[in-house]
Amino acid sequence: MSFKKRGQASLALSLAICMGAASAHAADDGLITKPSKYSVEETVARFEAAVKQKEAAGFTVFTEIDHAAAAKKFGLDMRPRTVILFGNPKVGTPSVIKTPLVAIDLPPKALVWEDDQGQVWLSYNSADYLFNTIYKRHGAEAPAATAPIEKVLDEMSDQATK
């Protein structure tokens, strides 16, 4: 292979690795992070709209917390970071009734944030992590199948970021 072709192959491999790093990924800690092509404000609005489209299935947006706005009140500067509390009370409420301490971790949250390079991201806990780690630590009973909930989370996050 010529030097030029090796260089092109190396460049192609480097680009593929970089592109893979920019796509959605789930860390070992259950956190799923997806890049957004929108601003923080638009990603928040799109995620909340996606959750509201699932109202018939029981999903709702409870509130949002704008960390940057709160920091500004105290003279602190931070890049945009907004937490959205959302969930499905049909699923979460029975768990909270039966195991009150699970409420410290419910409702689920999504974080929309901007990194130092200006890239916007949406992060949330996977359904598997929520039910098999968080519920487990409280001794709460988890649903038998997490895949359908994971699919809904994936759809909502894709709608917000793509």
Segments (PLM) and residue ranges:
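Bacterial N-terminal signal peptides that target proteins for export
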Residues: 1-12
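Compact, glycine-rich, soluble single-domain proteins
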Residues: 48, 52-57, 63-108
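Beta-strand/loop substructures that line and gate deep hydrophobic ligand-binding cavities in soluble
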Residues: 109-139
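C-terminal partner/receptor-binding element of secreted or periplasmic proteins
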Residues: 127-162
